[in-house]
Amino acid sequence: MSFISCNGRVIHYRYSNNNSDQTFLFINSLGTDLRIWDEVVNDLKAFGNILLYDKRGHGLSDLAKPKYGLKDYAEETYFLLENLSIKNCTVIGISVGGMIAPILAHRHPERVIKIIVCGAANKIGNSQTWNERIEQVRLNGLKSITESLMKKWFSPSFTEKYPERVAGYKNMVERCDIEGYIQACEAIRDEDITEISKTLKMPTLCIAGSEDQSVPPEGVRTLSQLIKDAKFEIINGSHHMTCIDNKEIFTEMIIDFIK
């Protein structure tokens, strides 16, 4: 395990330097940690170096200061790139990670050569839905929402085939720091990357799950239309966590895009 201090708070990361000219930076979804990418990484490590990390208040990373916005999450990601001397990367983000990725590219375009956005939109949800979720988690804990989350994350066929894995991801969310989870909810609630997305010029791939109820395909398509020449792909039958729910197709799309 590797750790680094950023603004007096620890970030957990994993960097595999394969002596490649290409580096993949992965940014996780709400309530998860870097382990969600394990199987994808196994398929992509032959194509480049791998950098994964835990967002603030997730996994083994410390909580952020109050009022931590998505721009702050992006800046701590830049801090990692800077301190690991990674000059440029292909950034892959899912859900909130798919909002952080364009922000990073906008603020530090010299560091991002390609963007892959999965299950994200220029605006996810609205204030009412996020405030309701925040209130529920504060009052009843993360266990009160994980059953419904798993149904949104994974298709019935995946759940039937891999019940133990779904149970493991449920445990992952339930063990997330509640304040870290709420801080991320607030950051998503308060962010709209519409104008940022219009400034991006690097090659971009936007991937949607056809059955995604968290971020419907229309939202992902709208984001792709904001980014110059972005490519839009749908994984049929997939729910929100495309990188797990349909890992093989997901990885094939990435490999085709980076070649």
Named regions from a protein language model:
Residues 9-62:
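Conserved HGGG/HGGXW glycine-rich cap/lid loop of the alpha/beta-hydrolase fold
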Residues 238-247, 251:
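Catalytic histidine-centered segment of alpha/beta-hydrolase-like enzymes
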Residues 125-128, 140-198:
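Conserved alpha/beta-hydrolase catalytic His-Asp/Glu region
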Residues 200, 206-208, 212:
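Short beta-strand/loop motif that positions the catalytic acidic residue
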Residues 221-241:
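Catalytic histidine neighborhood in serine/cysteine hydrolases
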Residues 213-219:
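Conserved alpha/beta-hydrolase "acid-adjacent" motif
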Residues 38-42, 51-92, 252:
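Active-site loop/oxyanion-hole signature of alpha/beta-hydrolase fold enzymes
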